[in-house]
Amino acid sequence: MNVSATKDVYKTSRFFYILEAAFEYFISILVTGAYLAKVTEAIGISDTLTGILTAFVSLGCGFQIIAIFLANKHPVKRWVTILHSVNQLVFALIYLVPFIPLTREQKTIVFVVFLLLGHIINNIVHAPKINWFMSLVDDKKRGSFTASKEMVSLIGGMVFSFVMGFVIDEFEAAGDLNGAFAVCGISVVVLMLLHSSTLLFSKEKPCEQKEIVPTKQLLGEFIKDKNLFKVILVAVLWNVVNYSATPFYGSYQIKELGFTMTFVSVTSAAYAVIRASCSKPLGKFADKHSFVNMLNICFTIAFVSFAGNVFAVPSNGKFLFTATYMLYAVAMAGINSSTINLIYDYVDPEKRMGALALSGALSGFAGFFTTLAVSPLVTFIQENGNTFLGISMYAQQLVSAIAATLLLVLLVYLNVVVKKLKNKRKDDVAVDEMPSNGAILVDVNNKEQE
């Protein structure tokens, strides 16, 4: 028996991928949300400008499209590692801005440049990096692997956020905000070094293409591939569903439902634990029965969650909204990684990097513009005393109904269109076979996968 032929030479690299994802997530925590707000407040940036910056950052997903033109840049390890390190170093420099002896306007310009540059570079390397590491994962174990990766990031992120929050609060209590910024900046640099190490010590699988297809020809084939766009549309439609409702739930919990910050923190922790604990079982299910069947289950659970929120009001909110939030956690345990895995199920290897990039860009745009479109409706209901068409309701109840309705459309699309596509998994699993006692949604197609 040839031992060397059966040795798994990428096992360590997959372990580094799990660590890489966790370190990158920790950095993202430090350059978004409350941490970023602390910096903008210290610089003197208005809440309005902060909101605009946040919006532009979310639109940075559009730069993922650049990866389509980098499809022939193999190997990717060297330039992805360099660019990723640069983008994270730029993020660290954000915490240096309050110390720079410049005017408020000049500090604002420097801050904006650092923030946008970091996110632009991060989006450019996102798809190539994912394609690099996911190519090291056995097709029969992708669901289980991505679940393990998510579990480490979720639990690790929860602990990291708690520790960093405690440290920053201690500095603020002592009146040393500059010390807090220094700790955050140094933390990003340390995480950047750890993150870069995981990339440097990981292996890259040799390119399977015997001949390099010219970029122009590859783009032509890419655009003509209707099946590719059918798969990407799942991620786009899900973001339309998700961002039509969830961005408005935060204020609903605090204002209308009257949740305390302590209660919100407890439910957030419970969300992370439930999502992490459900990731592995759902991943194993997908490995055995296909990601489409797993999405049928997860989308159905998400539908119940959104539908339940239609009835969540102050009198029952503490129970009902919390219950639906936990259901949402279960659903997201499978949905979150499914868009990547669907691409690896149905898209040709040479087109996967471009598909990942286009999926990230289009779904990001879809989410942003959906929230933008729904926002006036929310404002209208709130300004009219929580009534709509003469019916007394909270805006969040209506957007939940909209999300639930759109999700039914997505479920039909998944079964009528995507389930017909030819699966490209390199294994002999009957990917469309699903035990009848595990079915939550009736397969409206009811046809064997080609």
Identify the residue ranges that each predicted region occupies.
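Juxtamembrane intracellular "pre-TM" segments in multi-pass secondary transporters
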Residues: 1-11, 204-233, 424-450
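Helix-loop boundary and gating motifs at the non-cytosolic
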Residues: 1-64, 68-71, 87, 92-95, ...
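Hydrophobic core of transmembrane alpha-helices in multi-pass small-molecule transporters
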Residues: 22, 90, 105-125, 318-335
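Transmembrane alpha-helix termini and helix-breaking/packing motifs in multi-pass membrane transporters
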Residues: 42, 69, 73, 95-102, ...
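Loop-to-transmembrane helix entry/capping segments in MFS-fold secondary transporters
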Residues: 47, 139-149, 261-262, 349-360
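Helix-to-loop junctions at the C-terminal end of transmembrane segments
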Residues: 63-78, 278-291, 378
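C-terminal ends and interior cores of transmembrane alpha-helices
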Residues: 85-105, 300-316
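Intracellular juxtamembrane helix-capping segments at the cytosolic ends
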Residues: 122-137, 334-348
